[in-house]
């Protein structure tokens, strides 16, 4: 199984580009696991593969154990933000032993700095402490050394691997609302763009507020994406000049990697889709022929097929005059594409910190290994990534940078900066 995953990462993954040779060699450790399936063996195999994938710097690469508890792979019931010599607990949702502001001084007896000084730093996703993602190491830790914020006392705890999944909870009931902050400012928070009707409903209910506002503060700090349809209702309030939704979002076509492995999987997918949807034999054959003709040709440009209504120019609404967008590394997916679109609008200013930087590689493929595990990887690149101007690991930069400090444990500093602009 690992041989197949390694081959996919080297040849079929849209971000391969020779980077597979730079990944950690976990093969000797995988080989020691043996072939007999046991719960312990599977758990260790997942840990090794997840570490290998984390070192690519692309969170789109994932492996999932089928039939397991559908919690997020790296969930421990809290999140932590890295500083120079420790991790600060910045949110707790399912661990009553911890409080916001507590410090994590060591993981499995090793200081935080030790993880930055060897190959493990590649699994942190970020090049600066405030952008590091410690989820992998927290999830697989046996002990965490904690310093209490309130008392300064220290204790060791075992992470709660059965914690509720904050991401799943957020996806079930994503935060979405709009409210006035003062006579001239409206604040809108969107944590998901998946439900276009819900976004349209909030826009419709607050249309008057938005039109009268001098400034819209649009909070995308926790928005993991969703769909481009979820952006469309916002268009009249975000644009400077008349433009279609397609023009606003920019080129949404993709460079798809037609490797042999990808083409084999695409043909199998077409045959399955044909069977389920009742395609004619001619329709199926035409699509299979198209794929086979492109096999092993490398990256092939495929333009986006936009709905007709996305090509019709839209007039900007009378308000707001300015749009201030709140951003942090929790912003990902379609929300990052929205950020890039807003960078092209003169009325928009991005405040905070860079987004996650995980949207260069798209069009996810799923490989089923013996109905036991699923491996997920992207097979296409955005035009920007293909031209060497991607945002992977870097994110969309803020116009007004707000560095993370301990003050954010007590106050929403990014929002304060936005309101003062």
Residue ranges with predicted function:
Residues 1-216, 220-251, 258-266, 322, ...:
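Flexible, low-complexity junctional segments that flank or bridge functional domains
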